[in-house]
From Swiss-Prot:
Organism: Saccharolobus islandicus (strain Y.G.57.14 / Yellowstone #1) (Sulfolobus islandicus)
Listed GO biological process terms: rRNA processing
Coiled coil, from the record: none
Name of this chain's protein: Probable ribonuclease FAU-1
Lineage: Archaea, Thermoproteota, Thermoprotei, Sulfolobales, Sulfolobaceae
Family listed: Belongs to the FAU-1 family.
Enzyme Commission numbers on file: 3.1.26.-
Keywords from the UniProt entry: Endonuclease, Hydrolase, Nuclease, RNA-binding, rRNA processing
C-alpha cells in the first residue's frame, strides 16, 4: 500500500474508488461510503487527507505526507495544481518586515508554525509547537484541547489520561483527529517524542505537504463517470452539487432522472463570469445578458451580450473602445475556447475577434466559471495574432503536461480553422 488516505466531501465516492485502485488504503470512511464499497469502516490513522476546500467546493485540498503528487497529476489531468512552497505546521522565522520569502506573515511573530499556507499570498502563523499526526505540544497554561472531530466524551476522557500529566508540568496539548484511531501506548510514546522535540527545538523535519487543486469541468465529468460505476449518478453531478446539494440527491433516486431542469435553473438573465488563473486566483470579468441558451442532457450553450464601456483599447485587437461597443460571446460545455466578437456601438460593424482558450465552462448559480489556459488568439484586420504563449509556459508549474499540451492543441486547431475560414 502507498499510504493511508482519509477522504471527505462531495467527491468522496469517486475518489475512494480511484485511490483504492491506485493501491492506497482508505481509512476513516463514513458509514455511507463503507456501505457503498461493501467494506467495514477502517478505523486507522491517516497519512493523507483529501477533502473539499472549505471556501470553495470547486477546489479540493490534499494534506499530509506521502508519495501522492504524481497520482494527483494523473487523476486531475486537466485541473490547476498548487503545491505550497512552505509546509503546513512547519516552523519558520519571519524577517523584520513581517515576510517570509515573497509572502506576508500574519501575525508578525518572530517564529511560529504555519497554520495556513499562502494560497492567497499570506502565511498565517501560530506560536511554535511540536506537531505529529496525533497531537501538538507546546509550553503554556497547561491545558488540553481537542480537534472538533473528537466530540465523544468517553474518547476525550481517554485522551485526557495521557495529556493531564503533561498539563501539570506546564505543557499544552492539542489532540488531532487521528488520535481517536491510535492505541494509548502509541499516543503515550508520541507525546514523549513531541516533548523532547519541543524542548530540543527539533523542528527541521516537521510539516505536512499541502496541495490546493482547482478542478476543471472535464475532471469533474470524469469523476461523474467513476461515481456512476458505484451508484446512480447523473451527468454534471459534481457541478450541480456546488449549487444544489439536496436537489441532486433527490434527482438521483430516479434512475431516469435528467439534469436539464437543474442546469436551466443555474442560468439567470444576467451571468457573471469567473475567470480563474493558473495560480487559482479568480478574476471577475464584465458579465453579460443572456440572449440565447440551449440546455439538454448532453450539455449546454449560452450566448451573452456584454456591454463594453470605458476608455482604452480592445486587448489584442488594438482598436479603441467607444461608447456603446459590445461583445457577443458563446460559452459551450463542449468547447475549450470562447470566441469574443467585438462590435461597434455606432454602426454594429465587427471591430475584431478575440478567442480565449480555457477549459470548458461550468455553471454555478448566475455565474459561468472556467480555468484560463493563458494562451489566446486575436484576429485584427485579417491578421492572426497568438497571445501569451510565453505565459502558458511560465504557468505550466501549475498544470500537468496533458493540460499544457491540450492548450497548444486547441490553439493550433483554431489557427487552422481561421486560415480555412471555418471558425464557428
Amino acid at each position: 500500500m502507498k499510504g493511508r488516505v482519509r477522504i471527505r466531501g462531495i467527491y468522496a465516492t469517486a475518489l475512494t474508488s480511484i485511490f483504492s485502485s491506485l493501491s492506497y488504503e482508505i481509512v476513516q470512511q463514513s458509514v455511507e461510503i463503507a456501505e457503498r464499497f461493501m467494506r467495514e469502516v477502517n478505523n486507522l490513522p491517516a497519512d493523507i487527507t483529501i477533502k473539499d476546500f472549505e471556501y470553495d467546493r470547486g477546489k479540493i485540498i490534499v494534506m499530509g505526507n506521502g508519495t501522492i503528487e504524481e497520482d494527483l497529476h494523473d487523476v486531475f489531468k486537466y485541473s490547476f495544481h498548487w503545491k505550497s512552497p512552505i509546509k503546513l505546521y512547519s516552523v519558520i522565522e519571519a524577517d523584520e518586515s513581517c515576510t517570509y520569502g515573497n509572502f506576508k506573515v500574519e501575525p508578525c511573530l518572530e517564529e511560529g508554525i504555519v497554520i495556513k499556507p499562502p494560497y492567497d499570498g499570506k502565511i498565517v502563523l501560530s506560536e511554535t509547537k511540536a506537531v505529529s499526526k496525533y497531537a501538538m505540544v507546546w509550553r503554556g497554561k497547561g491545558v488540553t484541547t481537542f480537534s472538533e472531530h473528537i466530540n465523544n466524551e468517553e474518547e476525550r476522557l481517554r485522551l485526557l489520561t495521557l495529556s493531564s500529566p503533561l498539563n501539570r508540568k506546564g505543557y499544552n496539548v492539542k489532540w488531532r483527529s487521528n488520535a481517536k484511531y491510535a492505541t494509548l501506548n502509541e499516543l503515550k510514546e508520541d507525546l514523549e517524542r513531541l516533548v523532547l522535540r519541543y524542548e530540543n527545538r527539533e523542528f527541521r523535519d516537521q510539516g505536512e505537504d499541502f496541495y490546493l487543486i482547482t478542478l476543471s469541468l472535464p475532471d469533474k465529468l470524469h469523476l461523474d463517470e467513476v461515481r456512476k460505476s458505484i451508484v446512480n449518478t447523473v451527468k454534471y453531478h459534481h457541478l450541480l452539487k456546488l449549487s444544489y446539494n439536496r436537489e441532486v440527491d433527490s434527482l438521483e433516486k430516479d434512475k431516469e432522472g435528467s439534469p436539464v431542469k437543474l442546469l436551466e435553473a443555474l442560468i439567470s438573465d444576467f451571468m457573471k463570469i469567473e475567470h480563474i488563473k493558473a495560480d487559482g486566483k479568480a478574476i471577475y470579468l464584465r458579465g453579460g445578458k443572456v440572449i440565447e441558451k440551449e440546455v439538454n442532457n448532453d450539455g449546454y450553450r449560452i450566448t451573452l451580450r456584454r456591454e463594453i464601456n470605458g476608455n482604452g483599447v480592445l486587448d489584442g485587437i488594438g482598436k479603441r473602445i467607444e461608447n456603446g461597443d459590445y461583445d457577443i460571446v458563446e460559452y459551450n460545455s463542449d468547447k475549450w475556447y470562447q470566441i469574443h466578437r467585438y462590435y461597434s456601438g455606432i454602426d454594429n460593424s465587427l471591430k475584431g475577434i478575440y478567442i480565449n482558450i480555457s477549459t470548458p465552462p461550468e455553471l454555478l448559480k448566475g455565474k459561468i466559471r472556467y480555468l484560463d489556459l493563458e494562451i489566446d488568439i486575436a484576429i485584427r484586420d485579417s491578421e492572426i495574432i497568438v497571445l501569451d504563449e510565453d505565459e502558458l509556459n511560465k504557468k505550466s508549474i501549475y498544470m500537468y503536461s496533458s493540460l499544457v499540451n491540450k492548450a497548444k492543441e486547441v490553439a493550433n486547431y483554431l489557427i487552422d480553422c481561421i486560415q480555412q475560414n471555418k471558425l464557428i
